[in-house]
């Protein structure tokens, strides 16, 4: 944000209203992993605040709002305010989550019962050695932005949407929804690994039984209202935006071997609902409410790979294509 940006401008009010989101984009996760690494969960277990982040986030947002107010009150003190707020943020996170280990002794037993020992290792070394082979950092994010002014096969990005200074920007390749489906199905069938995605999880959802389908409820008949917005209009008029990230873990194909019937989804809402936390999504619901998937770059045809080297069309911070980070 440029110095002198009015506190009541649309940009500042948007950033302040979402000063610290609890979600995020694939690129954001990769930025964190590349800078800080990862540790096995057994060595840095869950806390009450990691399982329920609400109160912790309230305090972090309050800290950031206070810091911004102090910057506006005394512009000459911006650097010192940033330093103090950064230290305070680290302190709050440590109180709620604990201090991540700077190094650890890595020992494990594999699926065949064989014991292994790798000695002392840092989180960054662990990420590079044991996760780097999956090449997750080379994945690209595909989106289905249905608005006609945003051409398919072109890159788009969101201004001010980032989480690590100097990290990779959050950018997407805009593609047809069917191409996203084809990529997801190919990964599930050929590699058998989960596929990260972002969707508008609220419409036509049976949370208790774990189902998404476009014809799940007949609200129009109940209320006598024709809810006739298509996907483009829902995005344009703020009726829909991606708001939750999950993972595709399975696909159900019809007997013809071609038609996709439904998708199996691993959610993060606990195992007391749905099928022990797993949901079923109809293929038509994917069409209407799935907006983003992360896939290996190698799956893209030559013209799409070439498009990744072109500059992105930047959209404003409040654009719905940036909503998943809320």
Short names for language-model regions:
Residues 29, 193, 242-244, 261, ...:
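Residues that flank catalytic or metal-binding motifs in active/ligand-binding sites
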Residues 249, 254, 258-326:
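Conserved catalytic-core surface of thiol
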Residues 168-243:
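Long, positively charged binding patches that form subdomain-scale interaction surfaces
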Residues 40, 201-204, 254, 271:
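Solvent-exposed loop/turn segments at secondary-structure junctions
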Residues 1-108, 112:
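Papain-like cysteine protease catalytic cores
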Residues 29-31, 40-42, 195-198, 247, ...:
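Structural recognition of the beta-strand scaffold that forms the well-ordered cores
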Residues 82-186:
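Extended, H/D-rich, highly charged conserved domains that either
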């Amino acid at each position: 944000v440029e110095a002198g940006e009015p506190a009541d401008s649309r940009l500042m009010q948007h950033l302040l209203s979402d000063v610290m989101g609890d979600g995020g984009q694939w690129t954001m996760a990769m930025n964190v992993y590349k800078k800080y690494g990862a540790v096995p969960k057994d060595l840095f277990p869950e806390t009450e605040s990691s399982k329920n982040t609400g109160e912790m986030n309230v305090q972090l947002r309050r800290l950031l709002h206070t810091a911004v107010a102090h910057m506006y009150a005394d512009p000459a003190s911006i650097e010192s305010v940033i330093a103090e707020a950064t230290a305070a943020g680290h302190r709050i996170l440590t109180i709620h989550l604990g201090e991540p280990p700077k190094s650890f002794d890595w020992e494990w037993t594999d699926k065949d019962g064989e014991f292994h020992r790798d000695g002392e290792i840092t989180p960054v070394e662990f990420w590079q050695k044991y996760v780097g082979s999956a090449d997750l950092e080379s994945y690209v994010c595909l989106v289905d932005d249905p608005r006609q002014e945003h051409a398919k096969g072109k890159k788009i990005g969101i201004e001010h949407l980032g989480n690590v200074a100097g990290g990779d920007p959050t950018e997407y390749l805009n593609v047809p929804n069917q191409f996203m489906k084809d990529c997801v199905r190919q990964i599930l069938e050929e590699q058998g690994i989960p596929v990260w995605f972002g969707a508008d999880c609220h419409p036509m959802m049976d949370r208790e039984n774990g189902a998404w389908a476009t014809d799940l409820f007949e609200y129009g008949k109940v209320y006598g209202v024709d809810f006739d917005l298509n996907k483009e209009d829902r995005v344009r008029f703020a009726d829909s935006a991606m708001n939750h990230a999950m993972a595709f873990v399975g696909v159900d194909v019809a007997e013809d071997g071609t038609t996709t019937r439904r998708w199996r989804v691993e959610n993060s809402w606990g195992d007391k609902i749905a099928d022990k936390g797993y949901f079923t999504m109809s293929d038509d619901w994917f069409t209407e409410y799935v907006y983003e998937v992360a896939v290996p770059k190698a799956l893209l045809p030559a013209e799409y790979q070439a498009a990744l080297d072109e500059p992105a069309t930047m959209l404003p911070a409040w654009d719905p294509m940036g909503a998943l980070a809320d």
